[in-house]
Amino acid sequence: MDTDLYDEFGNYIGPELDSDEDDDELGRETKDLDEVDEDEDDDDVGDHDEDHPGMEVVLHEDKKYYPTAEEVYGPEVETIVQEEDTQPLTEPIIKPVKTKKFTLMEQTLPVTVYEMDSLADLMDNSELIRNVTLCGHLHHGKTCFVDCLIEQTHPEIRKRYDQDLCYTDILFTEQERGVGIKSTPVTVVLPDTKGKSYLFNIMDTPGHVNFSDEVTAGLRISDGVVLFIDAAEGVMLNTERLIKHAVQERLAVTVCINKIDRLILELKLPPTDAYYKLRHIVDEVNGLISMYSTDENLILSPLLGNVCFSSSQYSICFTLGSFAKIYADTFGDINYQEFAKRLWGDIYFNPKTRKFTKKAPTSSSQRSFVEFILEPLYKILAQVVGDVDTSLPRTLDELGIHLTKEELKLNIRPLLRLVCKKFFGEFTGFVDMCVQHIPSPKVGAKPKIEHTYTGGVDSDLGEAMSDCDPDGPLMCHTTKMYSTDDGVQFHAFGRVLSGTIHAGQPVKVLGENYTLEDEEDSQICTVGRLWISVARYHIEVNRVPAGNWVLIEGVDQPIVKTATITEPRGNEEAQIFRPLKFNTTSVIKIAVEPVNPSELPKMLDGLRKVNKSYPSLTTKVEESGEHVILGTGELYLDCVMHDLRKMYSEIDIKVADPVVTFCETVVETSSLKCFAETPNKKNKITMIAEPLEKGLAEDIENEVVQITWNRKKLGEFFQTKYDWDLLAARSIWAFGPDATGPNILVDDTLPSEVDKALLGSVKDSIVQGFQWGTREGPLCDELIRNVKFKILDAVVAQEPLHRGGGQIIPTARRVVYSAFLMATPRLMEPYYFVEVQAPADCVSAVYTVLARRRGHVTQDAPIPGSPLYTIKAFIPAIDSFGFETDLRTHTQGQAFSLSVFHHWQIVPGDPLDKSIVIRPLEPQPAPHLAREFMIKTRRRKGLSEDVSISKFFDDPMLLELAKQDVVLNYPM
C-alpha cells in the first residue's frame, strides 16, 4: 500500500480514480429484450456515466433514502403497513399510569397529644375501653362532634383545614354530597374530668334513614349508643327508629342534645323557653324508651349524667357535672358533684339564704339550670356576637380568657368558637357520661354474647367471651367490609370478643350459613396486617386483644356480609354470631346490564363487591336472566350505582326504571279443600289457606315469637295473644319461607283419620315444599305473606321408596299454590312512611303533592319552639319515585322530606280479573292497579301474562272444581 496516497488521518489524497461501478441499470430493464440490446444499453449507460458523472436524471419515485423493511428485518419477517390510525383520538398513544383513589387518607401519621404506645397499652386493659356508636337523625351534628374530638387529640389537624373538617367523611362522594354514606370508626384516647385517660372506639354513622343498615353494623360491635338530637328540631323520624333499634339490640342509651346555639342565635328563644324546649326533648325521648323497653330503670336525665349538651360548631360540650366543675375551678370551695344535682328541674337558688329551694323565692326567680347554665351561655354568645370591641375584652378577662389582638380581629364564627373552646375546655363531660353509663367491654360482654351468639353461653367458649378473656380461644365478629383506597380489595372490620388476633395468624372464617352440621360455609385464611382505624389514617399493630375493634387484611375473600373468625383447630364447637337484623326492608328494585355485553364478567365482579360494601344490599338474578339490585331508597341505590360504575367495575352500565317488590296474600278462606297427588299416585295432600290474624306476621318477623320454642311455650303464646285453640297452637309445623317468615303451616289432621307416624315421616318434605311455595308465589313469583296453610288430610305411602322428597316436595308446593288461588288472592305493595319538615305556608303544597301520588297525611303539627311544621304521611313506594324532587319544586325548596318503609298494604282490585283491559301509556283507575302490577311484573320476569292454573291443579282436582261448579277467572 502506497502511503503517499493517504494523509496522516487515512484520507485518500492521490489522483482521481476511474469509475469501476457495476451497472445497476441491468435490473431495471425488461426481461423481454434480447442479450444484444442489453449489452448495447449497458455500453451506452457506461459511456454516459463516464462522460457526465453525477449528472444522470433520477426520477423522484426512484430515489432511495432508506433501506426497505425487507433489507432491515430480513425476508422471513412479514411487515404490514397501515395507512389509517385505528386508535381513537380520545385514547392516548402511551397511556399514563392510573392511580385509583376514592378515599381521603393521611399520607403520614399525624401528631397526637398522646403517644401511640400509650394507646396500645390501653388496648390491653378492657376496663378502660369504651365501644360507642354515635347515631342520630340526618344533620344533627354527629360528624361535626367527632371533628371536635379529633381536633382535641390532633393539635395540628385544624391548621390544615380551613373549611369544616368532616374528618370521618372519608369518601370523595360523601364530601361532594355533604351526607354520610358509610359508618366510619375512630379510635382516640380521651381524658375525663379527673384527667384519667380512656380508649374510645367511636363509630360515626350516617344520619340518613336510607343508610340505617350502616348503623346496625355499628351497633352490633358497640356496648352503648350516644343519640344525637338537634335542639331546634327535636326528636325526628330517624331518632325514634334509632331509639327502638338500640333498645332491641340491648345497648346502653345516652343522649347528646346538640346545636344548642340554634336556640339562641337562630330561634332567639329566651333562656326560660330554651329550658322548656330542652326538657321537652328529654321527656319525649323517655316516652319513646318506655314504649319500646321493658326495663323500667332505663331513664334519661341530665341529673343522672346520661344527657349532655353540646354545640359542635362552637366547640361547646358539657354535662351538669362538667359545668359545675367550671364553677368549682373558678370560685373554689364548691362541692361540684352536689352542686350538679341541683342544676335541673324545678329547683331555684335563693340568693338571700344562699340555699336551693323547690319553691321560687320570688316571682321573677329563674330555675337553677337557667340561672347558672343558660344565662352565662347566652351572655358569652351575646357578647361575642354583639359587642366585640368595647365590652368583650373586659368580659373575657373576668372569665380568665386571654386572647391576642390577632385573635380578637377574627370573624364572628371563628372568634365565638375560640372563646367557647377556651371557656369550656376539652369534652370531658362527654367522656364522663360514656364512662359512667356505657359499660366497658368486660362488663358488657355477657349481655352482648347472650344477644348475638348462636351457640351456648355456658360452654367454655361462651364463658371466655363473657369474661372478655384475651388469653382465651380466638373469637372475632366482623360486621363491615371496607374497600381499599383503589377499590380492589376489602378489609374486614370487627370486634375481638375473646382471645387475641395476631398478624400472620392462620384463622378459620365462618360465614353466615355455617352450622355444626353443615360446615361448607367456612374457609381457612391467613390474617395479613392488622390496623386500628382512625378515619383517615390507620395505626398498624401486630396484635389486638379482646374488647377492641380491629381492621383485618387478608380474610375478605370468603366473607359476604358478616363473619365469625376463630382458630382453625381446637375450636370445633365454635358457632357463628347472628347475621345483622336490619330495622328497614329493601323494597326498591332496579335491573342492571352492561352497555357492552362482553363486559358482563366485570359487572358481575362489581356486583359482588358492592354486595360486600353495603350491609343490607341484595343482588340476585331473575329467571329471565336480568340482574336485579334491591335497596332501601333512591339515594341508597344512587350511591350503589356510583360505586358499581366508577369504583368496582369501571364500565358503562344501563339501568332500568326503578320498581318495587310486591307480596302476595289472601283475603278469605279457600272456597274448597284443595288436594294434589304425587306423580306416582301413591300420596295425596289436602290443604286450605286462610289469612293470618292482624299483627301476627309482624310478630314473627320481629322475633317476638320463634319457631324454635318448645311446643308448650309456642302454644301458650298463640292461645293467649291470638286466641288460637290449644290443638292448633301446638300443631304449628313451620313458619315460611324461613324461620322468621310471615306465613304459618299448621297440621290440622286428626289421628283418627290420618296415620300421624307416616305423616311425621314426610314432615320435612312437606315443610320444604311449603317454604318453596311461599318464597315464590303463583301470581308473580313474589313472596307470599300473611297466610296460614292448614293440612286437612294426607294419604302417605307405606313404603319409604314411594314417599321420597322428590315425590312429596313438588306436590306440597302445588297444593300450597292451589289452596292459595282458591282463597281470593290479592297483591300487596310496600308503603313508605314520610316525614316532611316545612314552614307553615308550605303545608298545603305538601298535601297536594301527596294526593297526586296516592298518599295521605296522618299527622300535621308544629314543632315546639320553632317556625316549622312536621307533616307525617304514608305513600305507596311505587309512587314515591321523584317525590322529593316534586316536593322541593312545589315548595321552592323549603320542604325537606325523608321516607322509610313502614308496612305492606293490599293493592285495590283483583289481580286475576280478566275483564280488566290494561291500556298502554294510560294511568289506570284504582280498581285496575292490582291487575296492572301483576301483568307488568310477570312480563318483566319473562313469565306468561296470566296465571295458568293447569300447573297447580291436578286433573282430579279440576273435576272436583267442575262438580262444585266453581267459576274461575283463571286461564286453563
From Swiss-Prot:
The modification Phosphothreonine is found at T86. Residues 127-409 form the tr-type G domain. InterPro entries: EFG_II (IPR041095), EFG_III/V (IPR035647), EFG_V-like (IPR000640), EFTu-like_2 (IPR004161), EFTUD2_N (IPR031950), P-loop_NTPase (IPR027417), Ribosomal_Su5_D2-typ_SF (IPR020568), Ribsml_uS5_D2-typ_fold_subgr (IPR014721). There is a cross-link at K64 (Glycyl lysine isopeptide (Lys-Gly) (interchain with G-Cter in SUMO1)). One of its GO terms (biological process) is mRNA splicing, via spliceosome. The modification N-acetylmethionine is found at M1. Keywords: Acetylation, GTP-binding, Isopeptide bond, mRNA processing, mRNA splicing, Nucleotide-binding, Nucleus, Phosphoprotein, Spliceosome, Ubl conjugation. Component of the U5 snRNP and the U4/U6-U5 tri-snRNP complex, a building block of the spliceosome. The U4/U6-U5 tri-snRNP complex is composed of the U4, U6 and U5 snRNAs and at least PRPF3, PRPF4, PRPF6, PRPF8, PRPF31, SNRNP200, TXNL4A, SNRNP40, DDX23, CD2BP2, PPIH, SNU13, EFTUD2, SART1 and USP39. Component of the pre-catalytic, catalytic and post-catalytic spliceosome complexes. Component of the minor spliceosome, which splices U12-type introns. Within this complex, interacts with CRIPT. Interacts with ERBB4 and PRPF8. Interacts with PIH1D1. Required for pre-mRNA splicing as component of the spliceosome, including pre-catalytic, catalytic and post-catalytic spliceosomal complexes. Component of the U5 snRNP and the U4/U6-U5 tri-snRNP complex, a building block of the spliceosome. As a component of the minor spliceosome, involved in the splicing of U12-type introns in pre-mRNAs. This is 116 kDa U5 small nuclear ribonucleoprotein component. It comes from Bos taurus. The gene is EFTUD2.
